């Protein structure tokens, strides 16, 4: 009963409309959130664009330690279409180490883009978005008795952000969720998922991450989140992404409204500091920047080759001229003799 009550509070705070109707676009879209939810206009909002040349390396940042995430558990997990995202409940036996306090898991959910789009993540790294993003939500159970109490306190929540890109093969871990989406096609529908290792949803290596203070990315946008965004990415197949983009509806019945593009745009950093657990090996370039760099290098090489060619031609002509002069002088000397 206690867990069910906790789940309701999680749903109310992190996914429900709190008494107001909100969407990602249109008259109730994210540009208008601050009207009904003042904290959405705050100066410590999430998500953000992480510029790696501006982050601060902190050697004292301990590694994130997910406890219990690799255990299968005994109880099925609730999967819910709340009209804004697909949300999976997590048992309180899951918690994080490596943070200032004990943070207990509550739920996870996904953000993605339009059908056919490869840009649907909320956080960006060097202005580059990925196909989707997984958020794993925790609350400070050491200091507060409930998630609803912790949600309005500084660093009351801790959220793990996992960027998801498209790879060549399917990811079996994500199929635990994606294979059930047809059962919750419409808003407010729920189903059960057999217990599985939640850790398999994460990237294999968790040592490299970014850390900053931010907010919930949906109303009421409480500025109470200690964010950890992993540098390594998880991968799903194109078919799995299409299933995520094409299955769900944000409405309760037909005519249905596709549940797509459920991500908030990056918010101003406003002098906040982003810490990194690792030293950047070098500048990280976006695809466009890499393409521009490649074109620039090719153009430079072409100019260099042309310059060498013209210099060689000039030297060759000069040598030919000198040779003719020598021949002419020799012939003249012979005649005079």
From Swiss-Prot:
The entry's substrate-binding residues are 217-218
Keyword annotations from UniProtKB, A to Z: Disulfide bond, Glycoprotein, Lyase, Membrane, Metal-binding, Phosphoprotein, Signal, Transmembrane, Transmembrane helix, Zinc
Ranges annotated as spanning the membrane: 291-311
Q: What is its EC number?
A: 4.2.1.1
Gene Ontology MF terms in the entry: carbonate dehydratase activity; zinc ion binding
Q: What are the top taxonomic ranks of the organism?
A: Eukaryota, Metazoa, Chordata, Craniata, Vertebrata
Entry's Gene Ontology BP terms = carbon dioxide transport; regulation of pH
Return the protein name: Carbonic anhydrase 14
Q: What organism does the UniProt record list as the source?
A: Mus musculus
Q: How does it sit in the membrane?
A: Single-pass type I membrane protein
Q: Which residues are glycosylated?
A: 213
Binding residues annotated for Zn(2+), in chain numbering: 109, 111, 135
User: Which residues are the active-site ones?
Assistant: 84 (proton donor/acceptor)
Tissue specificity, in the record's words, reads: Most abundant in the kidney and heart, followed by the skeletal muscle, brain, lung and liver.
Q: Which GO terms describe its cellular component?
A: apical plasma membrane; basolateral plasma membrane
User: PANTHER family from the xrefs?
Assistant: CARBONIC ANHYDRASE, CARBONIC ANHYDRASE 14
The protein's matches in InterPro entries, at most eight in alphabetical order, are given as: CA_dom, CA_dom_sf, Carbonic_anhydrase_a-class
Question: In this entry, which stretches build a coiled coil?
Answer: none
Q: What does the protein in this record do?
A: Reversible hydration of carbon dioxide.
Domain Alpha-carbonic anhydrase spans what residues?
A: 20-278
Identify the residue ranges that face the Cytoplasmic compartment according to the record. Answer: 312-337
Return the broad EC class.
lyase
Q: Which gene encodes it?
A: Ca14
- What Pfam family is a match, any one? Carb_anhydrase
* Catalytic activity field: hydrogencarbonate + H(+) = CO2 + H2O
The entry sums up its family as follows: Belongs to the alpha-carbonic anhydrase family.
Side of membrane Extracellular, spans: 16-290
């Amino acid at each position: 009963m206690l867990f069910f009550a906790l789940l309701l509070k999680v749903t109310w705070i992190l996914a429900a409309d709190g008494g107001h109707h909100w969407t990602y676009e249109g008259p109730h879209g994210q540009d208008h959130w601050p009207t009904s939810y003042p904290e959405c206009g705050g100066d410590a909002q999430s998500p953000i664009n992480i510029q790696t040349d501006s982050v601060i390396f902190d050697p004292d940042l301990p590694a994130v330690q997910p406890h219990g995430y690799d255990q299968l558990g005994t109880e099925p997990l609730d999967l819910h279409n709340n009209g804004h995202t697909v949300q999976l409940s997590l048992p309180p036996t899951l918690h994080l180490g490596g943070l200032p306090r004990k943070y207990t898991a509550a739920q996870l959910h996904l953000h993605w883009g339009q059908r056919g789009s490869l840009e649907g993540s909320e956080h960006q790294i060097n202005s580059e978005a990925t196909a989707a993003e997984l958020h794993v939500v925790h609350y400070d159970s050491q200091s507060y008795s409930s998630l609803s109490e912790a949600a309005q306190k500084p660093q009351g929540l801790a959220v793990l952000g996992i960027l998801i890109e498209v790879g060549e093969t399917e990811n079996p871990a994500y199929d635990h969720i994606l294979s059930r989406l047809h059962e919750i096609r419409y808003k407010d529908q729920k189903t059960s998922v057999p217990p599985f290792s939640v850790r398999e949803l994460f990237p294999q290596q968790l040592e490299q991450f970014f850390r900053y203070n931010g907010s919930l990315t949906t109303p009421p946008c409480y500025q109470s989140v200690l964010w950890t965004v992993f540098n390594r990415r998880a991968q799903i197949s194109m078919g799995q992404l299409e299933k995520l983009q094409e299955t769900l509806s944000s409405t309760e019945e037909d005519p249905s409204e596709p549940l797509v593009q459920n991500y908030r745009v990056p918010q101003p950093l406003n002098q906040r500091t982003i810490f990194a657990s690792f030293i950047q090996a070098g500048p990280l370039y976006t695809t466009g920047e890499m393409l521009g760099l490649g074109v620039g290098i090719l153009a430079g090489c072409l100019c260099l080759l042309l310059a060498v060619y013209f210099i060689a031609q000039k030297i060759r002509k000069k040598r030919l001229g000198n040779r003719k002069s020598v021949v002419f002088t020799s012939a003249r000397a012979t005649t005079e003799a």
